[in-house]
Amino acid sequence: LAPAEGIHPSERPAEADAPERQFGETVLKLENIELGFGGVKAINDVSFEVRKGEILAIIGPNGAGKSSMLNCINGFYKPQKGTITFNGRSMATMDPYLAASSGIARTFQNIALFRGMSTLDNLMTGRLLKMKSNFFAQCVYFGAAKREELENRAFIETIIDFLEIQSIRRTPVGRLPYGLQKRVELGRALAMEPSILLLDEPMAGMNVEEKQDMSRFILDVNEEFGTTIVLIEHDMGVVMDISDRVIVLDYGRKIADGTPDEVRTNQDVIDAYLGASHD
């Protein structure tokens, strides 16, 4: 579980020298979550909390239940047991639309962009929940609908500047390198102005330089926007560098929950990562 060679994305001071980061109240709470598919238990009695402003990593071998956990949080899956509370509100009846409307944004392990559309247009799809004009008013593109479109496009331009993708704003995303497509997907999630951001393997398939860039953007989103982040990532160097807290799943069970240093030396975690994948 040592940091990956060449990965030093965080500009935070070394842990020994850095002041302890302070977090707000609990914004997301999962209690005794259980999820199964037929006879297979994907998640088995898992509980944890996420605090406002925190970067929480969920790690574990393949098949440990990490993506299933994110799917429960944003309403793709309905747990058979347990409760999920977001900002004091029960999510028992949560669905993806309601989750997005409530301030939960998500990126996916496999890129889910509109490949024939430009970077700008893909980012604009992340603003649809913010637009109040109806379909016909938007088609006419006049008056309030036009003003709303211009205001939302101006906001998207700030995202483009933040992610340093000005040069590809008009490029169809299907023509972009993989690393830039991942950055556009992050931008679309940020366009929703989420209070909590779920990132499913945001650096999968990236080279060292691309991982450094993505790590920097994740840290900046957290520090500049105050966005709470829950991420799944297999690169342990990145996880240990940018996370405030790490949860480890194995065969659907939580086997560790603590700071990166605490998790790094946990024998159960070491044993899980030395074992075979569970796929």
Regions found by a protein language model. Give the residues of each.
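Glycine-rich phosphate-binding loops of nucleotide-dependent enzymes
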Residues: 4-279
